[in-house]
Regions:
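Hydrophobic C-terminal alpha-helix "anchor/cap" residues
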Residues: 32-35, 76, 132, 231, ...
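ATP-binding N-lobe of GHMP and related small-molecule kinases
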Residues: 1-99, 116-126, 151-153, 161, ...
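Conserved glycine-rich beta-strand-loop-beta hairpin in the small C-terminal domain of fold type I
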Residues: 246-249
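Conserved, helical-rich catalytic subdomain that frames metal- and/or nucleotide-binding sites
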Residues: 51-53, 142-144, 148-239, 252-267, ...
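DPxDG-like acidic metal-binding loop motif
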Residues: 99-129, 141-143
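Short glycine-rich phosphate-binding loop at a beta-alpha junction
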Residues: 90, 239-243
């Protein structure tokens, strides 16, 4: 059987505002981009009554049997959208879990994109968005991996990537609980992205923004604050900000050289922490 390899890239929240609360979830708006760090998904058709899913790699431990990939396949089977085809799927996890980089959600989105590209899955846009929402709120963001503006009304605008920034991403040995972080939100921000524009991805514009979840995470996890405080001192960083609900802290740079120098400084200070 032919085997396919799919790259599933990590996402970063360049900025995130919590605007209010809906019935079940908080209403947020965010600026999102994708980076070169990726998981690898290997897929092949098999003759079996069931799909087979395996996780390997450094960050494959403690992944539940009920995960974004199993949920996706169960939903597709329930709707008979795979025509009874079964697959063996192996995911090499290079993206840390609980890091705020949407590893699991992007795995599901990348697999959906692949199935559509190979005409294995034929689905209309409305049904596709509904499918993504059933798996996880971030999945829809990965269906087109370009600079993305998520408005508080749920609308998504994709933008052309015109400016390359280089990132130093540091994650401590622990992850942050998304549910816990959001449960501590007590105040809301005014909407800033109602009128999405390309200029929102310009470094000087991004520098003035925030991640509303960051202060909550820093209070809950003091060791995270120590990491961020050091990263702010790294020479020539444009800005430093947590992605998603953490626990990854990201420093942004104009040049690869400055980013590489910062990496060396960080590893000398925090050698035990994961960093790229």
């Amino acid at each position: 059987m032919t085997s396919f390899k799919i790259k599933s890239h990590a996402k970063l929240n360049l900025a995130l505002n919590v605007i209010g609360r809906a019935v079940k979830l908080h209403k947020i708006e965010s600026l999102i981009s994708f980076i070169s760090l990726h998981d690898l998904i290997y897929l092949k058709k098999i003759k079996s009554n069931n799909h087979k899913i395996f996780f390997t790699g450094k960050f494959s431990k403690n992944i539940s049997k009920i995960n974004t990939i199993s949920t996706l396949l169960n939903l597709l089977d329930a709707e008979k959208l795979l025509n009874n085809q079964k697959f063996e799927i192996k995911i090499r996890k290079n993206i840390p879990h609980g890091a705020g980089m949407g590893g699991g959600s992007m795995n599901a989105a990348s697999l959906i994109n692949f199935l559509i590209s190979k005409k294995i899955l034929k689905i209309k846009n409305k049904k596709l968005n509904d499918l993504a929402a059933k798996i996880g709120s971030d999945v829809v963001l990965g269906l087109k991996q370009s600079n993305t503006i998520l408005s508080s009304n749920g609308k998504i605008k994709r933008c052309v990537n015109k400016k390359t920034l280089y990132v130093l991403i540091a994650k401590p040995y622990f992850g942050c609980s998304t549910k816990l972080i959001y449960s501590k939100v007590v105040s809301f921000s005014k909407s800033q992205f109602k009128r999405p524009q390309q200029k929102m991805f310009q470094p000087q514009y991004l520098k003035a923004l925030n991640n509303d979840l960051e202060k909550i995470a820093l209070r809950k996890y003091p060791k995270l604050n120590k990491i961020r405080s050091f990263m702010v001192t790294l020479p020539k960083n444009i800005f430093v900000r947590m992605t998603g609900s953490g626990s990854s802290i990201v420093a942004y740079f104009h040049s690869q050289k400055d980013c590489s120098n910062a990496y060396g400084q960080f590893k000398r200070k925090f050698n035990s922490h994961w960093c790229i």
